[in-house]
UniProtKB/Swiss-Prot annotation:
UniProt function note: Also catalyzes the dephosphorylation of D-glycero-alpha-D-manno-heptose 1,7-bisphosphate in vitro.
Binding-site residues, substrate: 14-16, 22-25, 56-59, 113-114
Organism from which the protein derives: Rhodopseudomonas palustris (strain ATCC BAA-98 / CGA009)
SUPFAM superfamilies registered for this protein in UniProt: HAD-like
Coiled-coil parts of chain: none
Sequence similarity: Belongs to the gmhB family.
Stated name of the protein: D-glycero-beta-D-manno-heptose-1,7-bisphosphate 7-phosphatase
Phylogenetic lineage: Bacteria, Pseudomonadati, Pseudomonadota, Alphaproteobacteria, Hyphomicrobiales
Site residues (Stabilizes the phosphoryl group), renumbered to this chain: 56, 114
Binding site for Mg(2+): 14, 16, 139
Length: 180
């Protein structure tokens, strides 16, 4: 991304519990079950002019369940699958660390691990993001806390229809923009 590109808002989406079901330690496509309506939700964000990013804690790496390469391969496949449905993900960040990991190299506290804002802030530095109009959607308190730590709103998705949920978030963000 070039620094001269116009700033756009971003939707930072948690992976497990928003993009796909949270089936714990999903490291391969064989274990991934898409959240119904996710492609439509992402297309909605694309049409509204948002960058769409995935931010995800992947402690399965720290626990030796799968490798960083496995996670990257899964993410490439996910982005390709979504793209065939006209749903574009612009970038992905994941944190493989966990203080209780079984692999020494990954047993560390890391600002990128949610609730830390590291993944959000890294993407905002890499892409021309308008943080004043950006938000996070996640399924846990740590996702909302990461949003707050990054200075943006966080919305907690609890398994309803993700397409309808995204529509409601976009309406709320538009209302907030008008009232400011």
């Amino acid at each position: 991304m070039t620094a001269s590109a116009p700033r756009r808002p971003a939707a930072f989406l948690d992976r497990d519990g928003v993009i796909n079901y949270n089936d714990h330690y999903v490291g391969t496509r064989e274990r991934l079950r898409w959240m119904p309506g996710i492609a439509a939700a992402i297309r909605q964000l694309n049409a509204a002019g948002y960058y769409v990013f995935i931010i995800t804690n992947q402690s399965g790496v720290a626990r030796g369940m799968f490798s960083e390469d496995d996670v990257r391969a899964l993410h490439r496949w996910m982005l390709d699958e979504l793209n065939t449905q006209g749903a574009r993900i612009d970038d992905v960040r994941f944190c493989p660390h966990h203080v209780e990991g079984t692999l020494d190299a990954y047993r560390v506290a890391c600002e990128h691990r949610k609730p830390g804002p590291g993944m959000i802030l890294d993407l905002a530095k890499t892409w021309p993001v308008d943080m004043t109009r950006s938000f996070v959607i996640g399924d846990s308190a740590s996702d909302v806390e990461a949003a707050k730590a990054a200075g943006i709103p966080g919305f907690r998705f609890e398994g309803e229809d993700i397409d309808v949920f995204v529509k409601q978030v976009l309406i709320e963000m538009q209302r907030a923009a008008v009232s400011n």
